Amino acid sequence: MKLFILAVGHKMPGWIASGFDEYTKRMPPELRIELREIKPELRSGGRSAESVMAAERQKIEAALPKGARLVALDERGRDWTTMQLAQALPGWQQDGRDVAFVIGGADGLDPELKARADVLLRISSMTLPHGMVRVLLAEQLYRAWSITQNHPYHRA
């Protein structure tokens, strides 16, 4: 099984890439994280947020691995603790399907994409920069894996 992070956005600051890479390189070979950046749509010429999100949805769908479990990150999603993520991870691994976490653009994710998600997940109640969400998600995935392995990284 592979973990994919599909993120609308590109040209992130160096510290975002460094933070993200720090956690992805810690993951074991059987649970690699792959980042797929989706070029954001321009919201110019009076273009509505809805049309931007719909265009980004098409790009996201084109980048989704076939048959992957879809976890859409959204401010209205369910709150999971780190332990809940750690409990979900082994089941996902046994299932064998890849898991794709999707981070939307500035306007969020298209409602159609959210409706078909297997899980609608909120990463925080606070509004965060999308680049920071990449780092937080990679860290939480590493932490969840470390919990399943009784690794000393997680000490709560």
Curated annotation (Swiss-Prot):
> Which EC numbers characterise this protein's activity in its record?
2.1.1.177
Note the SUPFAM superfamilies from the entry: alpha/beta knot
Q: Name one GO cellular component term.
A: cytoplasm
Write out the GO MF terms.
Answer: rRNA (pseudouridine-N3-)-methyltransferase activity
What reaction gets catalysed by this protein? pseudouridine(1915) in 23S rRNA + S-adenosyl-L-methionine = N(3)-methylpseudouridine(1915) in 23S rRNA + S-adenosyl-L-homocysteine + H(+)
A Pfam family the protein falls into? SPOUT_MTase
This protein's record includes keyword Protease: no
EC category name: transferase
Which UniProt keyword terms apply here? Cytoplasm, Methyltransferase, rRNA processing, S-adenosyl-L-methionine, Transferase
Task: State the family it belongs to.
Answer: Belongs to the RNA methyltransferase RlmH family.
Q: How does it assemble?
A: Homodimer.
Q: What is this protein called?
A: Ribosomal RNA large subunit methyltransferase H
UniProt source species: Burkholderia cenocepacia (strain ATCC BAA-245 / DSM 16553 / LMG 16656 / NCTC 13227 / J2315 / CF5610) (Burkholderia cepacia (strain J2315))
Gene name linked to the record: rlmH
